[in-house]
Amino acid sequence: MACSIGNAFRCSSDTLRFAPRQQCSSRLNPNPSSFLSFNSSPILAQNLGASSSSLSRRTIRARTKMAASEASINGSNRMLVFVPPHPLIKHWISVLRNEQTPCPVFRNAIAELGRLLMYEASREWLPTVVGEIMSPMGPASVEFIDPREPIAVVPILRAGLALAEHASSVLPANKIYHLGVSRDEKTLLPSVYLNKLPDEFPKNSRVFLVDPVLATGGTIMAAMDLLKERGLSVQQIKVICAIAAPPALSKLNEKFPGLHVYAGIIDPEVNEKGYIIPGLGDAGDRSFGTETHWVK
């Protein structure tokens, strides 16, 4: 499903609905995914395989591969929000929402959700090298992630650590750069207290920016600005979040057209305290057991 979105959102527990206007198109897709386009026309990815050339034996020759679908989407000037319709994603979101979920279970759930979202976000985005090697039984065509192309994960502390916990098991040879951004609970403005980003990211880097909750948008906007200042284009960044809300998505769309956001779910609103409703509470406190009380 692909949808073009107007200026306002309204979501239900069963189906994402958007107001005031909505245009949807559906097509047969081997890897179905729901994604929402902040533009007037819908866009839907297709798996269009790339043809392979003959390979010499016992060698691995570098050839960057990217499916035509991903290339065409990246070439567009639209911000897309992907909500993968995977039953495990729905399961872990449900575990996270439950106020009775204890801290260890919550942290495991958010880590498993992060693994699934990174898997979906890396689909057809990571460059590969193809070639032929010898298996114990004879020659075999192979395809590996290209080790020359830098892959980085940037978790926003604290809760981003939990969501990115399984990044290394999904993404080969990735680097992790920590970024600490806190939010003033009165003004809701972000403040950077830890910055372990490089002065400049290597050329052709692909970066996964991980923040569990996109509510008012202050934290993710500050993080995006820091990445852009260090030489990254919007096409080199993918945002991973457990849950998102319209205020944050609208701000990202306005300033960073072309950005791709992968979310477990989109909720309809943010309250006056800056929390998503119904949301999942404070992801950092619930991940690390530091929540002493909760005022709804």
From Swiss-Prot:
List positions binding 5-phospho-alpha-D-ribose 1-diphosphate.
Answer: R158, R183, D211, T216, G217, G218, T219, D282
Q: Where in the cell is it found?
A: Plastid, Chloroplast
* Null mutant phenotype: Growth retardation, pale-green to albino phenotype and flimsy roots with less branching. Loss of uracil phosphoribosyltransferase activity.
Q: In which pathway does it act?
A: Pyrimidine metabolism; UMP biosynthesis via salvage pathway; UMP from uracil: step 1/1
Task: Output the Gene Ontology cellular-component terms.
Answer: chloroplast; chloroplast stroma; cytosol; plastid
Q: Does the keyword Plastid apply?
A: yes
Activity regulation field: Allosterically activated by GTP.
Q: Report residues binding GTP.
A: R148, E149, P150, I151
| Presequence range in chain numbering | 1-61
Task: Give residues annotated as binding uracil.
Answer: G281, D282, A283
Question: Which cofactors?
Answer: Mg(2+)
**One MF annotation (Gene Ontology) recorded for this entry:** uracil phosphoribosyltransferase activity
The record, for InterPro entries, names: PRibTrfase_dom, PRTase-like, UPRTase/APRTase, Ura_phspho_trans
Which reactions is this enzyme annotated as catalysing? UMP + diphosphate = 5-phospho-alpha-D-ribose 1-diphosphate + uracil
Give the UniProt keywords, A-Z.
Answer: Acetylation, Allosteric enzyme, Chloroplast, Glycosyltransferase, GTP-binding, Nucleotide-binding, Plastid, Transferase, Transit peptide
Which is a GO BP term held by this UniProt record?
A: uracil salvage
What family is it from?
Answer: Belongs to the UPRTase family.
Q: What is known of its domains?
A: The N-terminal sequence (1-125) is sufficient to address heterologous proteins to chloroplasts.
What's the stated role of this polypeptide? Uracil phosphoribosyltransferase (UPRT) that catalyzes the conversion of uracil and 5-phospho-alpha-D-ribose 1-diphosphate (PRPP) to UMP and diphosphate. Is probably the only functional UPRT, since the dual-domain proteins of the UKL family seem to lack this activity.
Q: NCBIfam families of this UniProt entry? A: PRK00129.1 (NF001097), upp (TIGR01091)
UniProt protein name: Uracil phosphoribosyltransferase, chloroplastic
- This protein's encoding gene: UPP
